[in-house]
A protein has these predicted regions:
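Conserved Class I SAM-dependent methyltransferase catalytic core
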Residues: 103-167
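Mobile active-site "lid"/loop adjacent to the S-adenosyl-L-methionine
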Residues: 77-108
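Glycine-rich, phosphate-binding/catalytic loops in enzymes
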Residues: 45, 86-90, 145-146
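Class I S-adenosylmethionine-dependent transferase superfamily signal
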Residues: 17, 90, 113, 117
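C-terminal beta-strand of the catalytic ATP-binding
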Residues: 77, 167-168
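Structural signal for short hydrophobic segments within the conserved structured cores
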Residues: 51-53, 97, 152
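Conserved SAM/SAH cofactor-binding pocket of Class I
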Residues: 1-85
Length: 168
C-alpha cells in the first residue's frame, strides 16, 4: 500500500502509520521546510522510512498521477475568529501556518485535497481528514458532490465531529 500524509508538520501521523503498517510505503508532504526538517529528524530518530517532500498542495506546479491507496490529512482548519478560544500551549508551540485559515475561506485545504484525491487516489482509495468540528456536514457534502462514496463523519470523545472518511 502507498499512503500519503498531506500537511505532515512534524511527521507524527506519517511516522505512526509507517510504524503501524511496516509493509506500506508512506509519503508525507508539507509546504514548510522548517517543519520537514523536524519531521526528518523524528523519522531518523524513530528509525522510520517515511519519504518527506516539500509540496504546496494549493499550487499546480507538480506532476500528479494516481498512485496512492490512502490519503490522510490534518490540514489547517482553525478560523481566525476562533483564535481567542485556543489554549495558550497550542498557540505557543504550533506555527500559525499549521493552524489557521482565513475566516472567509475556512475549507480551502479540504476543497483542494478533495480535488487532489480524485487525481492521486487509486480506484477504491480512501481519504481521511481531521476536521474543525463546525464543518463536518459541509465537508461530507463536498465529498458527496465530488463522487466520493461511503462518507462517514466520526465524533471525538467529546461528541464533536472530528474525522471524515470517504472512498474514491
Amino acid at each position: 500500500h502507498h499512503l500519503l500524509d498531506i500537511g505532515t508538520g512534524s511527521g507524527c501521523i506519517a511516522i505512526s502509520l509507517d510504524k503501524r503498517l511496516p509493509d506500506a510505503d508512506v509519503e508525507a508532504w508539507d509546504i514548510s521546510e522548517e517543519a520537514l526538517a523536524i519531521a526528518r529528524t523524528n523519522n531518523e530518530e524513530l528509525e522510520s522510512r517515511v519519504l518527506f517532500r516539500q509540496r504546496d498542495v494549493l499550487s499546480d506546479d507538480w506532476e500528479k498521477s494516481p498512485s496512492f491507496d490512502v490519503i490522510v490529512s490534518n490540514p489547517p482548519y482553525v478560523t481566525e475568529a476562533e483564535k481567542d478560544e485556543m489554549e495558550a500551549n497550542v498557540l505557543d508551540w504550533e506555527p500559525a501556518l499549521a493552524l489557521f485559515v482565513p475566516d472567509d475561506d475556512p475549507l480551502r485545504f479540504y476543497r483542494r485535497i478533495v480535488t487532489l484525491g480524485r487525481e492521486l487516489l487509486l480506484p477504491e482509495g480512501k481519504l481521511y481528514f481531521e476536521i474543525n468540528r463546525a464543518f463536518g456536514r459541509e465537508i461530507a457534502y463536498m465529498l458527496e458532490m465530488n463522487q466520493y462514496r461511503d462518507i462517514r463523519v466520526i465524533k471525538d470523545i467529546f461528541g464533536k465531529d472530528r474525522i471524515v472518511t470517504a472512498n474514491r
